[in-house]
Amino acid sequence: MQNNQMNPLEQGAPWLANYGDVPFHLEYPNVSIADAVLKTAEKEKDFPAISFMGKTFSYTVLVEKINQAAAGFVALGVKKGDMVTICMPNVPQAVFCMYALNRIGAVASMIHPLSAVSEIIYYLREVK
């Protein structure tokens, strides 16, 4: 589908008339999100990848952290197809873990640590 062509579901979406020259669709590569980040890191080594509370991580450092986390998960026995629950606040380490799991083919199930106990129990049961 061309970027400027609407699919049948979009033809009844009146807000699209206000998009102007903005494409209706973006083309994305058929790769994992971790692979997309790693490819970007090849080109943008020293460019800021994450900025958090005054600390900036370059793409080079991001890849190092992803690789370290991935090695740790593999050492724990995590493998492709596994689902791993991560209960962390929105900090860089949560990002490293998510990409690391994606890189090894596992799935990150992210839970916000301020969720109620009943919600956390529900989420943990859902991922089994």
What do the PLM-derived regions correspond to, one by one?
Residues E27-N30, L38, D46-Y99, A116-I121:
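Conserved AMP-binding/adenylate-forming core of the ANL superfamily
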Residues M1-N4, L76, R103-K128:
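Structural core segment of the AMP-binding/adenylate-forming
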Residues M6-L16, M53-T56, M110, S115:
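Generic hydrophobic, helix-prone segments enriched in Leu/Val/Ile
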Residues Y19-P23, K45, A106-S109:
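Residue-level signal for pocket-adjacent positions within structured domains
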Residues M1-N30:
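Flexible, non-catalytic linker and terminal segments flanking ANL/adenylate-forming cores
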